[in-house]
Amino acid sequence: MFEIELKAHVRNRENLIAELKTFATYEKTVERNDFYYGKEIESENSTLKNISVRLRKESKKTEQGTEIKNIFTYKQKEIKQTASKIETELNDEKECTVSDFAPIEEFLKDSGFILTLHKKKSVEGYILNTGFGTANIEVCNVPPLGDFIEIEILSKTKDEKTVKNIQNELVKILQRCKIPESDIESKYYSEMLREAQEVALR
């Protein structure tokens, strides 16, 4: 499955949540603790590229109770523009749950991967039925970056027509949240966190 996702800054979290409750359904509260491991490898054309994997410790609270998971993820990312130049993410994500991260961490270190980033994210999640499947809407706090909204729809394909239709749907949902398109953020969290670290070290 391919994730098609839009991310935007949230200037007023309380107003956003009040707006979401008028058209979307609350699903969960989640705490995510992410550890990114990266390695530089030689690609087919002999250029160097970075590959990374994520180890996520997730605690999810729903009406049924609390669920704790360890999730191993490999994700290939792209940035796609809409006709109006709005940028969204297109991600090919592969993941599985594991009982213990210790063996994976040892394997990664022995294979030359290094810990490149640690990210924490607190999430309040909502769902909305659309003509393109369920939209997952998450109101996120990512220290020290602040609050964001992420809107995601999964697709079995990534052909141009499907991607454009879903991109347009994501923008419509953002408009229903009364968040301006000027607040859309095309940078990855990892990029913003590294920039924040550099500023803090100056």
Q: For each predicted feature, which ranges?
A:
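N-terminal strand-loop-strand beta-hairpin
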Residues: M1-F132, Y188-R202
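Intrinsically disordered, low-complexity acidic/polar segments
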Residues: N15, T62-Q64, F148, K158-K161
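Mixed-charge, glycine-accented linear interaction segment located at domain edges/termini
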Residues: K158-K187
